[in-house]
Amino acid sequence: MILVGRYASPFVRRVGVVLHTLGTPFEHKGLSTATDLAAIKGYNPIARVPALMLDNGENLMESAAIIDSILDMTPGQTLLPATGAARRQVLQHCAIMCSGLDKAIQYIYEPRRRPAEKVHQPVLDGLAEQITASLTMLEALAAKGTFQGGAQANLADITVAVGWFFLHKGLPQIAVASQFPNLVALSARCETLPAFQACQLEG
């Protein structure tokens, strides 16, 4: 397998962490959407990351679809329950974080990709509100002990921990550590795991 994209992307990183957690061998090509679009299009014509090339040459895109496929190919995996309410719960917790991450990337791109006079502050304010709502929901869940982290981490733990690390690093004015202490603690438990250590952000 070949995983395409930089670990600076939380979506690429969560796929990498899942692969390492499962012990699935793969090659990582840290291609950037900023500088390597032509190469990325060889794996995904839409030029989005992550992309995953399977050993049979099939190309997969979008982190949720990639992870679902990986788990389906891994008998006995424990990251995501097979059926029922427990499965829905894990997927919903992932969805909350991924929704916040989608808005965070829009927030980061808005001032970078527009001339200063065309950046609309109400848009940024609305995105910040949505990111905060995502984190507030997850902090409340974490306070109830929903996320275990550590050696017992499931897909939601991985996704939330990866997402918090990205948000706190990239948008510390929104992902304020003192406001989300349980997410900070979850991240700390997870970042020491070998699978997380193997997917360090590029410089």
Residue ranges and their predicted role:
Residues I131-T132, E191-G203:
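Charged/polar, low-hydrophobicity segments characteristic of intrinsically disordered regions
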